[in-house]
Amino acid sequence: XYXDKSVYFDLEDKGNTXGQXXXY
């Protein structure tokens, strides 16, 4: 869980967080 950082991480590291935060 990231909270508000998940949004920034998803935009910055879409390739890295794509596997962890694929809730979007």
Swiss-Prot record:
GO terms for biological process: photosynthesis. Belongs to the psaH family. Coiled coil: none annotated. It comes from the Eukaryota. This is Photosystem I reaction center subunit VI, chloroplastic. Transmembrane segments: none annotated. Keywords: Chloroplast, Membrane, Photosynthesis, Photosystem I, Plastid, Thylakoid, Transmembrane. The keyword Plastid applies. GO terms for cellular component: chloroplast thylakoid membrane; photosystem I reaction center. It holds the Pfam family PSI_PsaH. The gene is PSAH. The keyword Nucleotide-binding does not apply.
